């Protein structure tokens, strides 16, 4: 089974492009800042920054409603791949493919109290 659930904030606005052709499809790429459990000795939170990709309707949703700092819950899967770059070096990739994206807090909740969260289904 390959299933991932992440909650975090976008590190920057998503990059969205559309495939060419008659049935063009949206592809959104973004990075999430996901806090790790526990804290460093200095009291700061450690975080991971997974690269994420959404396709189709999910990508259109991301383009329209999700921006830098937006807190989301993403359900998806991990996908690995590789390619050869322009210097003829093989590069390995790991991405989270988004299957469902939800808001982790309402606009009002994000401005007032982050403990009060409201989920909005995509």
Predicted feature locations:
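Acidic, gly/ser/pro-rich intrinsically disordered tails
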Residues: 1-2, 17-23, 39-45, 88-89, ...
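A short glycine-rich, His/Asp/Glu-containing loop-to-beta-strand
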Residues: 5-7, 25-35, 48
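OB-fold and OB-like beta-barrel modules that bind single-stranded nucleic acids
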Residues: 5-11, 32, 68-79, 98-101
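Active-site/binding-pocket entry motifs
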Residues: 12, 35-38
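Short aromatic-glycine-enriched beta-strand elements
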Residues: 18-31, 92-94
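Short, acidic/hydrophobic/Gly-rich beta-strand patch recurrent on exposed beta strands
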Residues: 29-34, 51-54, 94-96
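A beta-strand/beta-hairpin structural motif
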Residues: 40-64
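Beta-rich strand-turn-strand
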Residues: 55-91
